[in-house]
């Protein structure tokens, strides 16, 4: 076994539209009588590991949509504060008792002479459950702190991401509860206009549709940076289900046969954005966004007071929750092998065939391929939409679902036919513990000072994966490693060290090896 000191220097270089890539240049020193030279070609690049399996949506898509939705939300909150007071004053003149307009974000629980105790209890439960849903959406901070303390991931963008995601979700849920108010005369009180009798269709304002279908892009598990942990699974599944259930309960009272062309329009736009954005985002977050866009179609059917639409919503939520649980369970079970990035799924069919088959079936169900459960939910949804007269929206959903199959099929393809490529130098006894911990702490310190998501590069030193970030980190490092065998492959210019072969030292083409 050869003892070797490897020096490395990191630099950054931009490459067209594919983003920035880190390059490492190595040199070596010989020690005593062991004369081994190991050198890479100048500018040798680590392979691209792909995005994270549970990675967030691209910032290029999140930020414009999030800023636009948040700005519209603030503008119409200011507008509503004046219109709500005016509407409340008109109602007092007419003798209609409503809740004070100065109390924002509350469902009207004020009871007139015709309001029953059962109605009061129902709206109290609705308000309490909505607050619980928003609290769960805002409690992401606790789950994230748990992960940071356990060393799963770290980032300086903790407060920025947590504020951005939690506030958007809370405002989204609370505005829905505020936009539809039910008074004692069983009339729909709209903050953007006068009271509407129950026999007439309810108006759905423009910002309401924007909040529904544009804020859904903020529901992806952004703040977790794709960490496949049980905490991530809970806080990414439970708030969505809770908020969806509360929206359903409120929308049933605000429907009464409305034909909502605005929501049809924004739902079709959201479906198209999801199908095209998923091609850029390789992770499961695109599947989460897509299911929420189909959830917008569910709520359109509920607003049209369609019984099949309500049934399809409940079936779709149940099936999607089960697929989420299964997908997180599979990836969490593979945490011991450091499966976090898409490239880590390579050769999973050889090492763990049962998990690979289950994971592939789950992702195909996300895509809606028959005869899996995901196809059944979408089939039920599209036929319910056709039965309600949504002859334009249903074909759009079918086409975008077919386009989304390409993105959902990438993970099964890598797990079944991919090759696990990794720059690895297995640990030997010649690697001191102090040096090993120092190297790990250096990377952790570098990573925690960055805002962007983890990079796609890794170095495996002692049967684990240490990742750098997609940000420039400059400097030199020096490691004393026991080189067991020099690399045997040079197709991707990756250094691999295999178990020792007695009396042999192997080197791949493109690398110089001397004894």
Swiss-Prot record:
It is a multi-pass membrane protein. It comes from the Eukaryota. Signal peptide: none annotated. Its main location: mitochondrion. One of its GO terms (cellular component) is plastid. InterPro entries: ND/Mrp_TM (IPR001750). Keywords: Electron transport, Membrane, Mitochondrion, Mitochondrion inner membrane, NAD, Respiratory chain, Translocase, Transmembrane, Transmembrane helix, Transport, Ubiquinone. This is NADH-ubiquinone oxidoreductase chain 2. It comes from Beta vulgaris (Sugar beet). The gene is ND2.
């Amino acid at each position: 076994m050869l003892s070797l000191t490897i020096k490395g220097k990191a630099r950054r270089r931009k490459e067209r539209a594919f983003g920035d890539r880190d390059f490492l240049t190595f040199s070596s020193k010989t020690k005593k009588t062991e004369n081994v030279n190991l050198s890479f070609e100048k500018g040798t690049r680590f392979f691209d590991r792909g995005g994270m399996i549970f990675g967030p949506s691209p910032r290029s898509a999140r930020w414009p949509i999030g800023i636009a939705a948040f700005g519209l939300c603030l503008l119409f909150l200011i507008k509503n504060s004046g219109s709500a007071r005016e509407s409340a004053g008109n109602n007092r003149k007419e003798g209609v008792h409503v809740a004070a307009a100065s109390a924002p974000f509350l469902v009207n629980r004020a009871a007139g002479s015709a309001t029953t105790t059962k109605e009061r209890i129902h709206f109290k439960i609705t308000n309490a459950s909505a607050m619980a849903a928003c609290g769960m959406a805002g409690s992401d901070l606790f789950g994230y702190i748990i992960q940071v303390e356990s060393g799963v991931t770290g980032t300086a963008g903790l407060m920025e991401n947590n504020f951005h995601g939690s506030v958007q979700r809370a405002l989204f849920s609370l505005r829905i509860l505020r936009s539809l108010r039910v008074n004692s005369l069983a009339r729909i009180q709209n903050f953007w206009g006068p009271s509407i009798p129950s026999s007439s269709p309810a108006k759905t304002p423009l910002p309401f549709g924007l909040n529904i279908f544009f804020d859904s892009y903020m529901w992806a598990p952004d703040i977790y940076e794709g960490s496949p942990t049980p905490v991530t699974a809970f806080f990414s599944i439970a708030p969505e289900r809770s908020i969806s259930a509360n929206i359903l309960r409120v929308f049933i009272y605000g429907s009464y046969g409305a034909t909502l062309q605005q929501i049809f329009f924004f739902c079709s736009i959201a479906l198209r954005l999801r199908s095209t954005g998923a091609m850029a985002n390789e992770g499961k977050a695109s599947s989460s966004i897509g299911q929420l866009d189909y959830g917008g179609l569910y709520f359109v059917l509920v607003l049209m007071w369609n019984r099949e639409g309500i049934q399809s919503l409940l079936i779709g939520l149940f099936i999607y929750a089960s697929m989420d649980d299964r997908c997180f369970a599979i990836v969490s079970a593979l945490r011991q092998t450091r499966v976090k990035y898409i490239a880590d799924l390579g050769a999973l069919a050889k090492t763990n065939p049962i998990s690979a088959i289950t994971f592939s079936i789950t992702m195909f169900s996300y895509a809606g391929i028959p005869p899996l459960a995901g196809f059944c939910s979408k089939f039920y949804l599209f036929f319910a939409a056709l039965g309600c007269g949504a002859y334009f929206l249903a074909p759009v959903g079918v086409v975008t679902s077919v386009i989304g199959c390409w993105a959902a099929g990438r993970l099964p393809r890598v797990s079944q036919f991919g090759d696990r490529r990794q720059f690895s130098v297995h640990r030997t006894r010649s690697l001191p513990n102090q040096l090993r911990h120092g190297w790990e702490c250096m990377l952790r310190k570098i990573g925690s000072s960055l805002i962007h998501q983890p990079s796609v590069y890794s170095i495996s030193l002692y049967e684990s994966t240490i990742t750098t970030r997609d940000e420039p980190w400059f400097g030199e490092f020096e490691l004393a490693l026991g080189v067991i065998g020099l690399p045997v492959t040079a197709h991707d210019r990756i250094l691999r060290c295999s178990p020792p072969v007695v009396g042999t030292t192997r080197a791949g083409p493109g690398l110089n090896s001397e004894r």
